[in-house]
Amino acid sequence: ACMLGLAAVAKPLIIILIGEKWLPAVSFLQIICFSGMLYPLHAINLNILQVKGRSDLFLKLEIIKKTIAVFPILIGIFYGIEYMLWGSVLTSFIAYFLNSYYSADLIRYSTIEQIRDVLPVFTVSFTIAAVMWLFSLLDISVYIQLPTQIIVGLTLAFAVYERLRLPEYLEVKRLGLSALHKK
């Protein structure tokens, strides 16, 4: 969700932080965000291998994934950075399927089940990010645009997740409230 939000606010964020001369980097940041949105799922699936004592599988997967990661770099050498970044997005999806395939055998939680469980969160996140991105089309100062996008995104996220009562949201909310009460 955060990576999609970052992709949605990339243009005003880059202009504010490093200036208009860096506008060509907006698309690069957005592509990198798409590549990184699966990172939590990668981490969980790899942690399962470690917890279950399958460092052998972990090592094999890392070797395979690093080998696959060479291809986007080669693409980048010949076709440019944007193609390389899109290659890294593809590599991220391939790596997720590899990681989840092997962890699924260990915990009886298939890739399809994982996707089915995270699909509602991704759907809501994509929708909210799309609404946030629409604000980047307005011809207003980036100093108004960025805070507006962030406020709209946070408000929508809170309202939609409160309404849908998704288990993932409820768990994050419970943990957040618990941390606040400890202080």
Predicted regions located by residue number:
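A generic structured-segment signal
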Residues: 15, 94, 101-106, 114-118
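Short runs within selected transmembrane alpha-helices of multi-pass transporters and secretion channels
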Residues: 4, 27-73, 77-105, 149-154
